[in-house]
């Protein structure tokens, strides 16, 4: 299970975005408080941290075994809060990163065949640098991806 948390003392927008994103990908949202990176690594082997720039959520970092492995910089539209089930998410379109990193259906031959045959409720539509997040054809939010950087280990 992946865990999502925020930087310390997040703003209202960041908390709301974190909770909706965690629910979308079936992650566990953890209130960070005074937890250090070591404490978070003790909770889960893989965890995500959302950081703010000027009070808005702007950076999504993936940590594996305490090491930062991925950083996604983005801008965010308004977040629509909806009750969601535990169904898996699927990416539509060519994603710059493997959707499996997020715990979504992978874009392998078998994964693409499955997405054509089964209608999924949670979809991430990738159009260039924009990722549109939908649940039952209702848009939750839109991310405009500014930069994706991988850390070499």
From Swiss-Prot:
GO terms for biological process: rRNA processing. Keywords: Ribosome biogenesis. Residues 1-153 form the Brix domain. One of its GO terms (molecular function) is rRNA binding. Probably involved in the biogenesis of the ribosome. HAMAP family: BriX. NCBIfam families: PRK00933.1-3. This is Probable Brix domain-containing ribosomal biogenesis protein. It comes from Archaeoglobus fulgidus (strain ATCC 49558 / DSM 4304 / JCM 9628 / NBRC 100126 / VC-16). The lineage of its organism: Archaea, Methanobacteriati, Methanobacteriota, Archaeoglobi, Archaeoglobales.
């Amino acid at each position: 299970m992946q865990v999502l948390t925020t930087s310390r003392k997040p703003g209202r927008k960041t908390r709301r975005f974190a909770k909706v994103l965690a629910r979308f990908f079936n992650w566990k949202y953890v209130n960070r408080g005074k937890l250090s990176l070591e404490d978070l690594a003790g909770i889960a082997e893989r965890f995500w941290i959302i950081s703010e720039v000027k009070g808005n959520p702007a950076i999504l970092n993936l940590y594996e075994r305490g090491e930062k492995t991925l950083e996604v910089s983005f801008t965010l539209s308004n977040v629509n809060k909806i009750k969601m089930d535990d169904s898996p998410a699927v990416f539509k379109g060519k994603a710059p990163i493997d959707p499996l990193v997020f715990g979504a259906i992978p874009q392998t031959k078998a994964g693409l065949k499955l997405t054509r045959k089964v209608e999924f409720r949670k979809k991430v539509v990738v159009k260039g640098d924009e990722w549109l997040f939908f649940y039952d054809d209702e848009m939750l939010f839109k991310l405009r991806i500014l930069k994706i950087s991988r850390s070499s280990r």
